[in-house]
Amino acid sequence: MELLHSINDFNEAKQVIAGGVNSPVRAFKSVKGTPPFILKGKGAYLYDVDNNHYIDFVQSWGPLIFGHADEEIEENIINVLKKGTSFGTPTELETTLAKEIISCYEGLDKVRLVSSGTEATMSAIRLARAYSQKDDLIKFEGCYHGHSDSLLVKAGSGCATFGSPSSLGVPNDFSKHTLVARYNDLNSTEECFKKGDVGCVIIEPIAGNMGLVPAQKEFLLGLKALCEKYQAVLILDEVMSGFRASLSGSQEFYGVVPDLVTFGKVIGAGLPLACFGGRAEIMDLLSPIGGVYQAGTLSGNPLAVCAGLSALYKIKRDKTLYTRLNALAVRLAQGLKKSAQSYNIALETLNRGSMFGFFFNENAVRDFDDALKSDTEMFAKFHQKMLFKGVYLACSSFETGFICEPMTEEMIDLAVAKADESFDEIIKGV
C-alpha cells in the first residue's frame, strides 16, 4: 500500500490550513504517520486518493451508525436540499426531530438544537449555572466535553494525545470555577463538592475520549445522589454514547435520569447537529422565555435535521439493530484480545453497544490515570500496521472505535486476522 498522493495532499494542506487539518487528531501525530486523504466512503469502507480502501472503524468519529453514504438518508437529504439549505426560521422538521429524541430518553421534556457538541455542553453548563445560581463546575479527568475554555482542564482525547493537561490561551480566570475529580471515584468527587460552591456536574457516562472507559454503575448512581445532596445540576454528556450505545444511550446500562443531557453525532448522521435538553423548569430559562441567552445562525438547519431524523427513523424501525451491532463489537473485542494473548501482548478490550475500545495495558482501565499507563508506542506500531493492511482505526489510543450497520462477521474476522498478522510482525520486528 502506498500513500504518495496523500503525502502530497498533506504537504499542500499544511501550507494553507493550520497544521494541515481542521481537527488536531486527524494529523496522525500520535501514531507518527501521514493521514490518508479520503475520496469517498460507502457502507463500512473508506476509499482514499491513492486507490486504497479500508474497513472503517472510525465512522467519522461516531455519527455514521448506518455507515457511509446510506441510500435512504442520502435520498432524504437531497429532497430537502432541493427546497433550500437554510432559512433561519422555524421548520416543522425541527419539531419532529425534537419529539423523536425526547421519546427515547427518560426525564427529557424539551430540547434545543445546536450545531456541535461543544455548543451543546457549553450551553447546558450556562443553563445549569443559571438554574442553580452557583458558579462552580465539577468535571472528570479524561472526559472531553468540547473545546470551550472552561472545559479544557485535564480533558481527554487530544489533550491526552499531545501530553498537555489543558490548552494555551485559556486565562486562569476561565478555569478557576472548574473543579476536576477522578472518574469512577466518589470520594474524589465529594471532596470537590466540599471545596466549592458547585452548581453543576458534567460527565460522560460512557467516556470515549480517554479510550472507552464506562462509568461503574454504583459510581454513577452515587454521583446522582451527591448532586441531589448538594443541590447541583447533573449533566450527562451523551454526545458520543447517545443513540450509539443503545437507543436510550447510557440509560439502558445505568438507569440514571439526569437534569440535563447533551446529544450529538448520531442525531446528525454525519451533518453538523447536536442538542441539549432536560426538565422543562430548567429549559424554560432559555431565551426567549427566560434570561439565559443561546443562539445559532445554522441551529436546526433543515439538511442536518433531515439527516438526523432519517437516521432515527431507521434506528427505530430496526428492532434488532443494537443487538447485532453489540454482537459484532464483542466479536471484534474478543478477537483482538485473543490474538494479542497468543503473542504475550498485554491488551485490554471492551465495548458498550456499538462502541469499542482497547488499551495496550496489563490491567483493566477504570480512570484517566489507568489510561495514561497504556503503551502508546505499541499502539502507534499497531495502528500503522493495520492501516497498511486496510483496517482504519482511530489514530489515537485515547479514542473510541465504532461498529456500523453494514459491517459483517466476515469483515470483523478479517480485521482480527489482520491484527494477528500485525502482532506477528511487531514481535518479529518486521
UniProtKB/Swiss-Prot annotation:
PROSITE patterns xrefs: AA_TRANSFER_CLASS_3
An annotated GO BP: protoporphyrinogen IX biosynthetic process
Keyword hit for Lyase: no
Pfam families in the cross-refs: Aminotran_3 (PF00202)
Record InterPro entries: 4pyrrol_synth_GluAld_NH2Trfase, Aminotrans_3, Aminotrans_3_PPA_site, PyrdxlP-dep_Trfase, PyrdxlP-dep_Trfase_major, PyrdxlP-dep_Trfase_small
Residue positions, PTM N6-(pyridoxal phosphate)lysine: 265
Subcellular location: Cytoplasm
EC numbers for this chain: 5.4.3.8
Associated pathway: Porphyrin-containing compound metabolism; protoporphyrin-IX biosynthesis; 5-aminolevulinate from L-glutamyl-tRNA(Glu): step 2/2
Catalyzed reactions: (S)-4-amino-5-oxopentanoate = 5-aminolevulinate
SUPFAM superfamilies: PLP-dependent transferases
Any Gene Ontology CC annotation: cytoplasm
Any GO MF annotation of the entry: transaminase activity
This protein's UniProt keywords: Cytoplasm, Isomerase, Porphyrin biosynthesis, Pyridoxal phosphate
Cofactor(s) needed by this chain: pyridoxal 5'-phosphate
Coiled coil feature spans: none
Broad enzyme group: isomerase
Quaternary structure annotation from Swiss-Prot or TrEMBL: Homodimer.
NCBIfam families in the cross-refs: hemL, PRK00062.1
Family statement: Belongs to the class-III pyridoxal-phosphate-dependent aminotransferase family. HemL subfamily.
Protein name, per record: Glutamate-1-semialdehyde 2,1-aminomutase
Biological source species: Helicobacter pylori (strain Shi470)
Lineage: Bacteria, Pseudomonadati, Campylobacterota, Epsilonproteobacteria, Campylobacterales
GN (gene name): hemL
